[in-house]
């Protein structure tokens, strides 16, 4: 390619060839009907979220998400001038707590923000969960006389374990904006490349995409890197060998259960979210750190009393950690 095509400025919406290939890849995999006009190239899923949040809201609007949730949602929504409401977790399943959602939905809610497969729990929202969420949002949109958008944050979409029910969320609700990153699927997190996909039948779909370059100007994100846009155009639809994550999950989950930890089995990602062995998960994680276990307290994910394990490491390191988890559990007996 001409060096200018690789290193020059790209069009504001992203390189057309890349957008076309992404749309075609989604349609082939999920039976959808995206066109290039429905795709906006972004600086990773975070960049896609920054655009999605601003494209379908006004400052002061309310966004609802579900615990446990990615800790960065708080600054992301605050930066857009939005109120973030976090629905308490159903700690037995980590599926959506619908009873709590129904009490919080009101006419000021512009969008629901979900993350499946989920960071930090590793849980994948089931088809039943997504169908129920779609039904509720459809009914409430009619009641409030405005669309309630569903912003689906999906950087872990391709890390799904064998036999897990993993619906493509946009196929169940037209007013869906999907935020995707290639960082996990092809193991390129430092390249910060992703996209926003707006369902073709989404309310004001054309306007949502059209406003994105203007949003880029206001937040200083002036286009995803041209070189990486060209790169992902040739690999969309492919993934790295992600099997190590499922291997690590099986080893870790079975061992923790044997040692007495309570944990909902992950359906994807490379995270696990067990209950802490004491109510204060921050204190528990400090004790773990003294044994060289680096864990993250659940408090920052809106779910105290739990902790996150990341097992995106060589399997030998997971196996090396097992005796330490066992010893830690024994100290609480």
Predicted regions: what they are:
Residues 91-162:
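Active-site phosphate-binding strand-loop segment of PLP-dependent enzymes
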Residues 29-31, 136-147, 200-206, 332-333:
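Alpha-helix termini
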Residues 226-233, 245-257, 263-275, 305:
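Conserved glycine-rich beta-strand-loop-beta hairpin in the small C-terminal domain of fold type I
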Residues 79-85:
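A short helix-loop-beta submotif of the ANL/AMP-binding
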Residues 102, 237, 283-296, 300-333:
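PLP-dependent enzyme catalytic core of the Aspartate aminotransferase-like
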Residues 175-246, 250-253, 323, 329:
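Conserved core segment of the aminotransferase class I/II
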Residues 1-44, 51, 228, 235-238, ...:
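N-terminal small-domain helix-loop-helix segment of the aminotransferase-like
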Residues 55-77, 90:
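Conserved PLP-anchoring active-site segment centered on the Schiff-base-forming lysine
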